[in-house]
Amino acid sequence: SNLFSSWILPSLISNFASRYPNIRINLIEENTTQLTELLQKGIVDLILDNTTLDSAIFDSKLYKEEHLVLAVPHSFSINSELTSFQIPNDLIERKDFQMDSVPVVPLRLFSDLPFIMLRNENDTGRRARLICQDSNFKPNIILNMDQQMTAYNICQSGLGICFIGDIILSRIPHNKNVVYYRLPTQHNTRRVCFYWKKGRYFSRAMEEFLNECC
């Protein structure tokens, strides 16, 4: 997705290219469905994704574990009532927000507020809906988007609440227009992995790239 191609892969590719300048790397931006199809056809060697792909078809290597976070516009008055649940940005960067010292916010308190969701076919969108369901409410969805960063940018503008992964939050500049909250553990943790087609030739370049990244 353009999330990874914009915020994660450029630095990984740059570091690898500086060590192996003779290896040519092409970066393709597509959604998960299209990338998976390209991988299965052998058009691309590797993809990086937060969706779990079929282990009977694809091999994988863990890049990082990611946690979803609730992002709420700072302008929403409910924030003044929930200061003890708010996550400082430095904790997000250090990934300490899953510690017991950071309380889980009672998500149902946001049930009457507007949400910016990713579509249900997106892993983030599916997980967000399950988290709300487990908190016994149906979110008031005013917009369905395709990309995390688009939803987050709309959240920054003050329009609605969104769910976003901590990997991207650790890479983008801190924004004072957003307040962050820890979510219930169930459904909010996922593995971001590199995938390649099982049984396909696994080149030395692919091996070195994965060793460099993971």
Segment roles from a protein language model:
Residues 20-26, 138-142, 191-193:
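Residues at or immediately flanking beta-strands
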Residues 31, 35, 40-43, 50, ...:
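Hydrophobic hinge/microswitch elements
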